[in-house]
Amino acid sequence: MLLVAALHAIEVAMFMDEKSIASIDQAKEAALRILLHNAHGQFQGLPRTAGWGYPEPYTRDLMISALGFLATGNEELADALRRTLVALAENQTARGLIPSLAHDPDDRGASDTTPLFLFGLALYRKSANLPEFLNQAAQSALKWMQYQSPDDRVMVSQLPTSDWRDEQWVMGYGLYVNTLVYAYLKLYGEHESAGQLRELMNRLEVCGEAKNPHEHEGLVVPSKPYYALYSYKVLNSDRFDLLGNSLAILTGIASPERARDLVAWIEAECEAMRARGELAVDLPSCLFPYILPHHADWHPRYEIYNRPGDYHNGGVWPFICGFYVAACVAVGRMDLANRKLLALTELVKPWHENEAEWGFNEWIHAQTGQPSGRDWQTWSAAMYLYAVQCVQRQDTPFFGDMRPGDLNR
């Protein structure tokens, strides 16, 4: 252990000066303060989604934040996760669907809340050594998810605007939601189903009219290392989804070789975007290329909420960048992971609506680098802390056992 710690100290020193290390420490302290501030909200005492703008306990935000909650080792945050899981189980529908708000059983219709509940519950069980915690709710949720596969072959489908991107069109077999399905299948020991899903996702995406009607859609983009945004029958989008692809790396859906190529491709594409003035920061946009008004997949409503480089149409989201830092660690690119962590530390500093020393904003405008969402966002703070732990430990807690042995744990 002493040797590992010494080697880590040497590696950190190679990439970070004292000022950078101090800045990360300050950001860690601020992130923890934000999470503790948000741990008790006005809705049944459940955690807030943000310090100001979002007082509600949004399921997806809090389940994603489980990674950061548990990474801190803080008992109050672990209890906040436990209370949220209990509330979700109590408000689960009779058939197993998990609502979008932890306190409101009638806020339904999301495609990612049930797989995220299963994911967050598995993390809590492992951390607390409670393998049977909320078992009835887990079994009901697993059953619900089985019926979300249109052809009864594990891969699940979704309706547009039903996942975390409530202002973006993703339909059919979406990458992000299916990476969550793969993750919970691995965590719950459903290895046969997980293997089947991984095989399906790694098939070539079939485009055009000549598709064999008996061939299942895949998500691999021909001649590219990344996975498509979505695919369903003759419809698909080969735009790049940073969250989905980062999860594909972390979970081991991507082979070690593909994962390394994918990270290299992301960096090359982002460098080209910066050269064109499309990206102002040293972190990737959540989606690219951006959807423009003359593109076939543009929707009139995007002019209001989803302009190019904004929000779900290429905004830079700190919580997603936390996953990307972890993905860099997963492929063994510690030099890159350190650099991206420093960039993320700079990204979470500015505030937008509420003056604070550290903003931990919701999302950042890609072309200007200016914060544009809500400050003190729970998942922004939580995933920052998770990213820091990944870099400092040089592994990816909770994900390592999902990946093939030759991909860095």
Q: PLM ranges: what are they?
A:
Residues 15-56, 83-107, 147-172, 202-316, ...:
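Extended glycan-interaction surfaces of carbohydrate-active proteins
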Residues 78-82, 135, 195, 260-263, ...:
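Conserved positions within tetratricopeptide repeat
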